[in-house]
Amino acid sequence: MTDEELQAKFLYDNGTLRNKFTIKNADELSLIEYRGVAEREVALLQQQPKIKSFEDLQTINKFLFGWLYDWAGELRNYYISKAGFDFLEYDRFDNAIKYINDEIGRLNKKKQPTIEDYAALLNDLNYIHPFREGNGRSTKLFIQLIALHHGQVIDYPADNAEMIAGLNQSDVGIIAKTMALQKSAG
C-alpha cells in the first residue's frame, strides 16, 4: 500500500483516525477512545481470560477498539515506523507469531515468571507492532492477563518515556526496570 492509500484508508483529510462515529475532531476522538477502552480493559481484567496464543492478542485488540474502529484486531499488511523506528515487516509475521506462541507456552509453564520474562515478551510484541492502533494498550493488557494467571500483577510506569526508550533500543533490562511485579490479591 502506498502512503496515500494508507492515509485514505485510516485517516480523514484532517489527520484524525477514521472511526465508526465519524468523529473528525482528534481531541474529542481521543477522549472517547480513552474512556471506552478503559471500560473494556476493566471488563477483561475482571473476566481474566487465559492467554494461550497470539490470537488472543488479536481478540483483545478487537474487543478494546472494535466498537470504534472497523480495522480493530486485524493484522497490518503494510510497513510501519514511528519516530524513525522501523517495526517488523508484515510479511514476516508468520514466523514472529510462531515465536510468540512458543514464548507464551514457556511463560504459561513457568510457576513464577520474572519481570524480565514479561519485559522480553513486551519487547518482542512491540517490535511486531501488529495493529494500526492500540498496540501498547493491547499488549500491556495481554501480558497483564498472563501475569494474573500466575498470581502476579504488573505495574507499568505512569510515564512511558523510559519504557519507550528501552523498547526503541530493544533493551529488555531497561524495559524491566520500568515495570514492577507484585503478587495479586486474589
Which sequence ranges carry the predicted segments?
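FIC/Doc superfamily catalytic core
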Residues: M1-G186
